[in-house]
Amino acid sequence: MKKPIMWVAALLTASCTPALKVEVANTTPTERDDETVEIAWSEVAALKGVTPDNIVVLNDDNEQIPSQVLFRGGTEPQALIFQTDADPMESKRFKLVTGQRENYPAEAFGRTVPERYDDYAWENNKVAYRLYG
């Protein structure tokens, strides 16, 4: 059973402004770090001229934050994700706009282990895994 950790409301105001406004609320009494926020691409597509290559997420200070478009194995975008921290009972606002996306350093790494053609290893800043074939 999934517990609702973060609540997301996309305020579809694209027809009024060149941005979509998103409010993310932590409705729990627990601090949330690096919580992933997912917005269906069908909601993002309400933004005029948006493509997977030009969607940008801005915080309240108009600073661009890393985001990623999910395709889930297909050729059409399915969702937009980004991460944020949230204190207990805190709400944050973000804007989705079109623009030039910044390049961000990779935070995860994966590779096929050359010593064994059927092994795979991957890691990020919190965990590391190795799959033995």
Name what the model sees in each region.
Residues 17-112, 117-119:
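Alpha-mannosidase-like glycoside hydrolase catalytic domains involved in N-glycan trimming
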Residues 8-9, 132:
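A ubiquitous, low-specificity "background" feature that marks scattered single residues
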Residues 2-8:
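Sec-dependent signal peptide recognition
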Residues 9-17:
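Hydrophobic h-region of N-terminal signal peptides that target proteins for export
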Residues 117-133:
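Acidic-aromatic substrate-binding/catalytic surfaces of carbohydrate-active enzymes
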